[in-house]
């Protein structure tokens, strides 16, 4: 590569790194289903909604005294299954398999002990930014 190719390569590398750092805007359910007092700060004072979403975080400035830019709820296989653990309503029995849970048209996540692993989905109609 000649001297003219080096600046082009530098630009491509910088753009590539920016794409790796920039987050993806979380789904509405991952943001709106998190109660304000459970928000974990993801930004800095004065952050804009655009900057916050670029970090892959949620933004909601409608509640005073809590972080406006905050980490979203964990991703799930279906938007209907995104909810706080405290919102889970049991749809199964202890030791239920993912397959048995799915046959009941319910959500399954066994990442947290002592909460329902098989739980009823929620409508996505209430999800918003």
Swiss-Prot record:
Task of the protein: Inhibits gastrointestinal motility and gastric acid secretion. Could function as a structural component of gastric mucus, possibly by stabilizing glycoproteins in the mucus gel through interactions with carbohydrate side chains.
For this UniProt entry, the molecular function terms from Gene Ontology, in alphabetical order, are: CXCR4 chemokine receptor binding
- Which keywords accompany this UniProt record? Disulfide bond, Repeat, Secreted, Signal
Q: Name one GO biological process term.
A: negative regulation of inflammatory response
Task: Give the matching InterPro entries.
Answer: P_trefoil_chordata (IPR017994), P_trefoil_CS (IPR017957), P_trefoil_dom (IPR000519), P_trefoil_dom_sf (IPR044913)
Quote the Pfam families the UniProt record gives.
Answer: Trefoil (PF00088)
| Record-level GO cellular component terms | extracellular space
Protein name from the UniProt record: Trefoil factor 2
Say which species the protein is native to. Mus musculus (Mouse)
> What residue ranges carry the coiled-coil annotation?
none
Q: Which domain of life is it from?
A: Eukaryota
| Cysteines paired by S-S bonds | 29-127, 31-58, 42-57, 52-69, 81-107, 91-106, 101-118
Tissue specificity here reads:
Stomach and pancreas.
PROSITE patterns registered for this protein in UniProt: P_TREFOIL_1, P_TREFOIL_2
Please verify whether the record's keywords include Manganese. no
UniProt domain P-type: residue ranges: 29-73, 79-122
Task: Name the SUPFAM superfamilies for this protein.
Answer: Trefoil
Q: Which residues form the signal peptide?
A: 1-23
The record's listing under PANTHER family reads: INTESTINAL TREFOIL FACTOR-RELATED, TREFOIL FACTOR 2
State its location(s). Answer: Secreted
* Gene name per UniProt: Tff2
């Amino acid at each position: 590569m000649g001297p003219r190719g080096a600046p082009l390569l530098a630009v491509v590398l910088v753009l590539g790194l920016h794409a790796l750092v920039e987050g993806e805007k979380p789904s509405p359910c991952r943001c709106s289903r998190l109660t304000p007092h459970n928000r974990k700060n993801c930004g800095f004072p004065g952050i804009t909604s655009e900057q916050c979403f670029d970090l892959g975080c949620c933004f909601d400035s409608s509640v005073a005294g809590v972080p406006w830019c905050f980490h979203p709820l964990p991703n799930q296989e279906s938007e209907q299954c995104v909810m706080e653990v405290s919102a889970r309503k049991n749809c199964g029995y202890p030791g239920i398999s993912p397959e048995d849970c799915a046959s009941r048209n319910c959500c399954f996540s066994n990442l947290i002990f002592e909460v329902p692993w098989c739980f009823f989905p929620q409508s996505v109609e209430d999800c918003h930014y």
